[in-house]
Regions:
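Bacterial Sec-dependent N-terminal signal peptides
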Residues: 1-23
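Cysteine-dependent hydrolase recognition
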Residues: 21-250
Length: 250
């Protein structure tokens, strides 16, 4: 029993060392705050456009939100999830993350009950078609996964099965987003950099939201106009300028 316990401790320590080795750089916040934010980026993207990413970090901290930059040679999504949970348990507590560049994508099996319209026979169709790509892998800590394998053609796709011990509903501990390029080769770095510069510029503008376009899929709430009334009122309450300008469209 004691030997098994020692082996378990050793394996956990070994995983920690491996994960730590894949993190090539951590840039800590320059300000203090009640919560924090983190930018996760692959090392190649950071080496190409580090100046713009640092400026993006600066623009976030100008809004009084402490910001980390975590750079790594990511091998598994688990590495990133582990680091996110560690930041969440630290002070100031992590409130959100953004993934920039080539960040691994978790392709989840046995998770179709979390989706609204994705229904496919997992036994009949190949993994790449019948798995659910989801960043809930990173931002919902009550979901538990078992690693299956890596995709044979797309180096960013990693397959996991959702374990029965997972929560039956989605309740994210943090928010997350991706800045993922659509172009290939060197052009993808230029595309990310262009977007970051646009975000930095917009953050400096004083431009209150006065027009709001709302849309939904065909058949949503059975196309009932009455069902939309409360939603419209909530948008007017959340975005008062739209009411003044008659700027809500749906």
């Amino acid at each position: 029993m004691f030997k098994k316990f020692c082996l378990l401790i050793f394996l956990c320590f070994l995983n920690f060392i491996i994960y730590a080795q894949n993190i090539t750089q951590i840039i800590k916040p320059k300000i203090n705050g009640h919560t924090s934010f983190a930018i996760f980026v692959d090392d190649k993207t950071f080496s190409k456009i580090s100046e713009s990413i640092l400026e993006y970090k600066k623009s976030i901290e100008e809004k009084k939100l402490p910001c980390y930059i975590i750079v790594g040679k990511w091998v598994l999504p688990d590495e990133i999830r582990s680091e996110i949970i560690k930041l969440y348990n630290n002070k100031p507590k992590l409130e959100g993350v953004v993934f920039i560049g080539d960040i691994p994508i978790a392709m989840i099996r046995e998770a179709q009950h979390y989706t609204s319209a994705f229904k496919m026979d997992q036994k009949k169709f190949p993994f790449i078609r019948s798995s659910v790509p989801s960043d809930r892998f990173y931002d919902d800590f009550d979901l538990h996964f078992k690693f299956l394998n890596k995709d044979s053609t797309d180096e960013l796709l990693y397959y996991y099965t959702l374990l029965p011990s997972s929560s039956p509903i989605i309740e994210k501990e943090i928010y997350s987003a991706r800045i993922k390029p659509t172009l290939k080769g060197e052009e993808k770095y230029q595309q990310i950099e262009k977007f970051l510069k646009k975000v930095i510029r917009i953050k400096k503008e004083k431009n209150p939201l006065d027009k709001f376009l709302y849309g939904c899929a065909e058949g949503y709430v059975s196309n009932s106009h009455d069902a939309f009334i409360s939603e419209v009122l909530s948008y007017f309450e959340s975005f008062p300028k739209t009411k003044e300008q008659n700027g809500l469209f749906y």
